[in-house]
From Swiss-Prot:
Its EC number is 3.4.11.-. PANTHER family: AMINOPEPTIDASE, AMINOPEPTIDASE YPDE-RELATED. GO terms for biological process: proteolysis. Belongs to the peptidase M42 family. This is Putative aminopeptidase YtoP. It holds the Pfam family Peptidase_M42. Its cofactor is a divalent metal cation. A divalent metal cation 1 binds at H66, D180, D235. Binds 2 divalent metal cations per subunit. The active site is at E212. The keyword Metal-binding applies. The gene is ytoP. A divalent metal cation 2 binds at D180, E213, H320.
Length: 357
């Protein structure tokens, strides 16, 4: 990963963008996509795409990451100035206590920490039972409710995790918040950049959706706007290699993920064979992936009259927490694969994929 790409991801991952609050990510994406696109389109939920126009009868290829990251929303302020909150996206209670967060206010970001009880004050029963998220609060250092309001806190504000973008001792691994799914946002930008000035056999829509983490909502509206012939979702999925078991799905550094099954999608046969053939032909490392989660492909593939879809992913350790790790070789494989796939999608190829059900 070159320094320019690394800088792109440092900016993307550090921007705040909980579901329904993707505006800062969207503004940056529009700025970057506009450098390489013929024009920019946006739906009324906020999903945004750079468009490379092909011939009038050319197939429409949709490529999308999602802008939102798992986060929280302020729901109320207690009399002593602590904040009650609601999760946005899937969080496990055991990864939350004592984690740093930022509340995005009109006065700028306000630092806070999810409150925890020191072990000295816990009863035996409390020690052995995980705390429910509904009982957690965020401490911003306010003296009381009035002080919190003075600081700028209001119900409805977004809260995001805090984790600096950090190249690790093994420089092929990078630690940050929000790899799920600023990976897909950055790859959409880099796709248009790599194809800038090159003739395409299709009309390409590359960008990112909103509100994926709360039900794939942006994918549904974006697919109705674009009406694609094929869809490539770009998403980060959970690595499961921490135990050292090489048979588990999701191994860092072993190539891009080909998601063949999850709870929202059974991969289209024609797309599966198309991706596998291209990966084998060009010797691009890949790994099969089965997931209990879902991606934007879950909504897009059942939109309109049906859209053959594939997920070109990478795995990330510890997703849906403050601190997540990716391997840059996996990103390189995903990028190479996506470029090969998109440039191969002429009308004849797309028609053949559609017929291979």
């Amino acid at each position: 990963m070159n320094q320019e790409t690394k800088a792109l991801f440092q900016t993307l991952t550090q921007l705040p963008g909980a579901p329904g609050n993707e505006h800062q990510v969207r503004a940056f994406m529009k700025q970057e996509l506009a450098k390489y696109a013929d024009d920019i389109v946006q739906d009324r939920l906020g999903s945004v795409f750079g468009v490379r126009r092909g011939a009038e009868d050319a197939p429409r290829i949709m490529v999308a990451g999602h802008m939102d990251e798992v986060g929280f929303m302020v729901t109320s302020i207690t009399d002593n100035g602590l904040l009650r909150f609601q999760t946005l996206g899937g969080w496990w209670s055991q990864v939350l206590l004592a984690q740093r967060v930022e509340i995005q206010t009109d006065n700028g970001p306000v630092p806070g920490v999810i409150s925890s009880i020191p072990p000295h004050l816990l009863t035996d029963a409390q020690r052995n039972r995980p705390m429910d998220i509904k009982n957690m609060m965020i401490d911003i250092g306010a003296d009381d409710k009035e002080d919190a309001i003075k600081i700028g806190i209001r119900p409805g504000q977004q809260i995001v995790p805090v984790c600096p973008f950090t190249t690790m001792a093994n420089e092929k691994k990078i630690l940050s918040k929000a790899w799920d799914n600023r990976y897909g946002c950055g790859l959409s930008i880099e796709l248009l950049k790599e194809l800038h000035g090159k003739e395409l056999p299709n009309t390409l829509y590359a960008g990112a959706t909103v509100q994926e983490e709360v039900g794939l909502r942006g994918a549904q509206t974006a697919s109705h706007m674009i009406k694609p012939d094929l869809f490539f979702a770009l998403d980060a999925s959970p690595a499961n290699d921490m135990s050292g078991d090489k048979n588990e799905f999701g191994q860092l550094g072993k190539g891009f993920l080909l998601r063949i099954l999850d709870r929202t999608t059974v991969m289209h046969r024609g797309m599966r064979e198309f991706v596998l053939d291209m990966a084998e032909t060009h010797d691009i490392p890949y790994q099969y992936f089965v997931s209990g989660g879902g991606t934007d492909a879950g909504k897009v593939h059942i939109s309109n009259s049906g859209v053959p879809s594939a997920v070109i992913g990478i795995c990330s350790r510890y997703i849906h927490t403050n601190a997540t790790i990716i391997h840059i070789d996996d990103y390189a494989a995903a990028k190479e694969m996506l470029i090969k796939l998109v440039t191969a999608c002429d009308k004849q190829t797309v028609d053949a994929i559609k017929e291979n059900m």
